[in-house]
Amino acid sequence: DMVSFVSSWTADYNDPDNFIYTFFGTPEKSNVRSLNYFNTDVMSRVAAARGIVDDTKRLTEYAALEKQIVEEDAAWVPMFSRSHLFVKGDRVASFTPHWAGYNDTQYINVTLK
């Protein structure tokens, strides 16, 4: 038997820290989200990763952290990621969706012919 629960999260900003720090950055963050994941080595690495300025090094470290959390420790099991579909009519010259996919009320990136 294994105790588990299901939750959802949508990215607030386009950065892996949005997920990793939010859920695994400190014992308090892990506990309040019912993850009860207390790998202090990972939490120290998350704190250090937040200060990495070089984008390539930073993304490499976040990928390694995700591998540790998901594959090695099995503390988090991503179940799905939403797909966002858009239809563009003949009168639209260009359309650039929001990076996170939601555009239901944002027409600032639309150019008409």
Name each model-derived stretch.
Residues 8-11, 39-40, 74, 98:
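A broad, low-specificity signal for short, low-complexity segments enriched in glycine/proline
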Residues 15-19, 41-48, 57-68:
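Extracytoplasmic/secreted proteins, especially bacterial periplasmic and envelope-associated proteins
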